[in-house]
């Protein structure tokens, strides 16, 4: 890697935003009913569905109801009812399940919600005493799909003889079944799971796919027109709120970018909002959602400044100013960074202004996270400018931080409600295994994408490149190893609800960060940098309503 000294780097090749002023000027297509009418109808339907939870007396009905409500994306209305139902399901265990599908579904729902179920309880439904797979389960694609999804909640203590080989077994037979005669909607559900297993799928992404599938299941026992209507109305009403916020944040970004004039950065405000929305999509999380989206954008600005424009000396001065966090240090910076630095500080001040008096301390953690990120960006810049390829261990220790999981885990807490305790902030800012694992998912998937597509930023050598050089192996071996580290990281994330039960609501939000990375880097793409590849997905979330 060539040393670039103190000269500015070449201009980037980032494509311009695919959105422009789209959301600033956007006028939603009128629906058949007004927002007020939808909100009133939702309140009525919510009461009806609450009654369904109360009316469920057997475990099978409770399990199916929880599954449907979650996959339709309306579980945020029924948190207490779901917790009560799952506690009852947990007491019943898996042993009395009548099928592989039923056992695997219970296993997944319980583990996702922080109820521990030993893997052995599920393995009984798929293996004989001698360890061989039970004859006949290969002819049960619905059961195999449920097994495949459930087994992806594997943790570190469960080894390769239980859930991991169940994943391999189920995948092999699902791929074969998919090539044959699977019917809709099972065929589509298998296809989605083979791309991203359900426990790693974003709630809103699954809801968009599952709502029309649920509509087609009117002959099924789990079908309810009341639940379906609630899901459609809730999605559309929330989408209107998200469209209003996109208008606001797009204008914020237009004003900010116009003032600071950093033409070399990735113009991705809609993508930053999407990232935040994947963590906080609910109506009651509007403050948290908008703060996190802005933190995303500010970290992206910082990343691109270090990676594609600043000389080494400029990078050092910028980091020094960020560590001191004093506007008077602006005089130390080159002209093009002065406005940027002042705007960073003023935006963090605005974050604090949005907090109640007893919440003001949160911004101290927010700033500290940004400072830590800057320090690690500088280390990468030092490596790059000195032509250094670090050891794999050193590279990972720095790049997992620059992947942003820590600063974003702090940022997602800033605007939250009572769940965002001091304990939660200490957990997020510390070297916590779950936060680190989320960072590994982000970093390794990003690096595998960059290796496949070719880097278009002046980054230091990636984890893939460092592994190849250090171990003198072909790229296929390095990529396989990095991919195995992603799977190890998911085991750590899966363990977090049981290791940190008091922080479960926060753990869920952090897990959503890892899920969003999985979608952004699906099939080794980079849907943030190359956001043209992601436009259709964003349209399904923010432009197209669901027909009523």
From Swiss-Prot:
Gene3D superfamilies: Farnesyl Diphosphate Synthase, Terpene synthase, N-terminal domain. GO terms for cellular component: cytoplasm. A motif (DDXXD motif) lies at residues 303-307. It is found in: Cytoplasm. Its main location: cytoplasm. Substrate binds at residues 303, 307, 443. The Asp-Asp-Xaa-Xaa-Asp/Glu (DDXXD/E) motif is important for the catalytic activity, presumably through binding to Mg(2+). Sesquiterpene synthase that catalyzes the formation of a blend of sesquiterpenes and sesquiterpenoid alcohols. Converts farnesyl diphosphate to tau-cadinol. This is Tau-cadinol synthase. It comes from Zea mays (Maize). The gene is TPS7.
């Amino acid at each position: 890697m060539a040393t670039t000294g103190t000269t500015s780097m070449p201009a980037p090749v980032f494509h311009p935003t695919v959105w422009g002023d789209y959301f600033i000027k956007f006028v939603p297509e009128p629906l058949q009913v007004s927002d007020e009418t939808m909100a009133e109808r939702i309140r009525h339907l919510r009461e009806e569905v609450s009654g369904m939870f109360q009316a469920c007396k057997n475990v099978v009905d409770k399990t199916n109801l929880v599954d449907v409500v979650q996959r339709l994306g309306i579980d945020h209305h029924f948190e207490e009812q779901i917790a009560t139902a799952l506690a009852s399901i947990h007491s019943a265990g898996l042993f009395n399940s009548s099928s592989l599908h039923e056992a695997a579904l219970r296993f997944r729902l319980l583990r996702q919600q922080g109820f521990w179920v030993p893997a052995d309880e599920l393995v009984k439904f798929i293996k004989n005493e001698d360890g061989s797979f039970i004859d006949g389960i290969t002819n049960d694609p619905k059961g195999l799909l449920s097994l495949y999804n459930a087994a992806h909640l594997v943790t570190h203590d469960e080894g390769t003889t239980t859930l991991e080989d169940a994943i391999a077994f189920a995948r092999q037979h699902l791929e074969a079944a998919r090539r044959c005669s699977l019917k809709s909607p099972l065929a589509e559900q298998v296809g989605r799971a083979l791309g991203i297993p359900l426990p790693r799928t974003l709630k809103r992404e699954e809801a968009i796919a599952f709502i029309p599938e649920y509509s087609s299941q009117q002959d099924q026992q789990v079908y309810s027109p009341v639940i379906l209507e609630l899901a459609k109305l809730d999605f559309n009403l929330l989408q209107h709120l998200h469209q209003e916020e996109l208008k606001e944040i797009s204008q914020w970004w237009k004003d900010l970018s116009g003032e600071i004039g950093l033409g070399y950065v990735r113009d991705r405000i809609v993508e930053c909002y999407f990232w935040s929305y994947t963590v906080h999509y609910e109506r009651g999380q509007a403050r948290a959602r908008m703060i996190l989206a802005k933190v995303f954008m500010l970290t992206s600005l910082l990343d691109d400044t270090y990676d594609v424009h600043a000389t080494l000396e400029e990078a050092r001065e910028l980091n020094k100013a960020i560590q001191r966090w004093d506007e008077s240090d602006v005089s130390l910076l080159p002209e093009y960074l002065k406005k940027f630095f002042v705007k960073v500080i003023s935006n963090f001040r605005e974050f604090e202004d949005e907090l109640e008096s007893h919440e003001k301390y949160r911004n101290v953690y927010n700033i500290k996270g940004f400072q830590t990120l800057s320090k690690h960006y500088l280390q990468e810049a030092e490596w790059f400018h000195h032509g250094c390829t670090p050891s794999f261990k050193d590279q990972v220790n720095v790049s997992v931080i620059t992947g942003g999981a820590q600063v974003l885990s702090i940022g997602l807490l800033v605007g939250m409600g009572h769940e965002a305790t001091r304990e939660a902030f200490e957990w997020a800012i510390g070297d916590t295994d779950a936060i680190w694992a989320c960072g590994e998912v982000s970093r390794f998937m990003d690096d595998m994408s960059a290796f496949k597509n070719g880097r278009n930023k002046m980054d230091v050598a990636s984890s893939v490149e460092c592994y190849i050089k250090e171990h003198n192996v072909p790229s296929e071996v390095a990529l396989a190893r990095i991919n195995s580290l992603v799977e190890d990281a998911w085991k750590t994330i899966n363990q977090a609800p049981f290791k940190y039960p008091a922080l479960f609501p926060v753990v869920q939000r952090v897990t959503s960060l890892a899920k969003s990375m999985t979608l952004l880097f699906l099939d080794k793409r980079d849907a943030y940098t190359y956001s043209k590849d992601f436009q259709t997905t964003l349209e399904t979330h923010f432009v197209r309503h669901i027909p009523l």
